[in-house]
Amino acid sequence: MSLSDPLGDMLTRIRNAQRARHAACVAPASKLRANVLEALRREGYIRGYAQEDLRKGVAQLRIELKYLDGEPVIKEIHRVSKPGRRVYSKIKELPRVYAGLGVSILSTPRGVLSDAEARAANVGGEVLCRVF
């Protein structure tokens, strides 16, 4: 299956699994997806993830979702920069998500970082998604 936006597909799988109260979900593996999941794990939005090999050359990511008192930790997760319209931001121009309660995930020259990590490193980049 050909996807025009693989990262958007993974974010949709996470959103749907959380709404259905699943403990975990799976998505095809890629380096960008794994890096975004690592940033979400560091920020406390998911419990963890693991790469599983299905067969030679084909892998998937198993994403362990996180809940607090039975409610999903991720209330909203949206793709910002899309294949048809890329969104780049200097770090000084990057707005805070819900006045600092949420997180933006950026692809920077230093790797995939949360907005707080990017501000500390003073580096901007492509705004991949916003999470609250």
From Swiss-Prot:
Domain of life: Bacteria
Quaternary context: Part of the 30S ribosomal subunit. Contacts proteins S5 and S12.
Native source organism of the sequence: Gluconacetobacter diazotrophicus (strain ATCC 49037 / DSM 5601 / CCUG 37298 / CIP 103539 / LMG 7603 / PAl5)
Keywords annotated in UniProt: Ribonucleoprotein, Ribosomal protein, RNA-binding, rRNA-binding
Chain's role: One of the primary rRNA binding proteins, it binds directly to 16S rRNA central domain where it helps coordinate assembly of the platform of the 30S subunit.
A Gene Ontology term for the protein's cellular component: ribonucleoprotein complex
Official protein name in the record: Small ribosomal subunit protein uS8
Family statement: Belongs to the universal ribosomal protein uS8 family.
Transmembrane regions listed in the UniProt entry: none
GO molecular function: rRNA binding; structural constituent of ribosome
PROSITE patterns attached to this UniProt entry: RIBOSOMAL_S8
Entry keyword DNA damage: no
One record GO biological process: translation
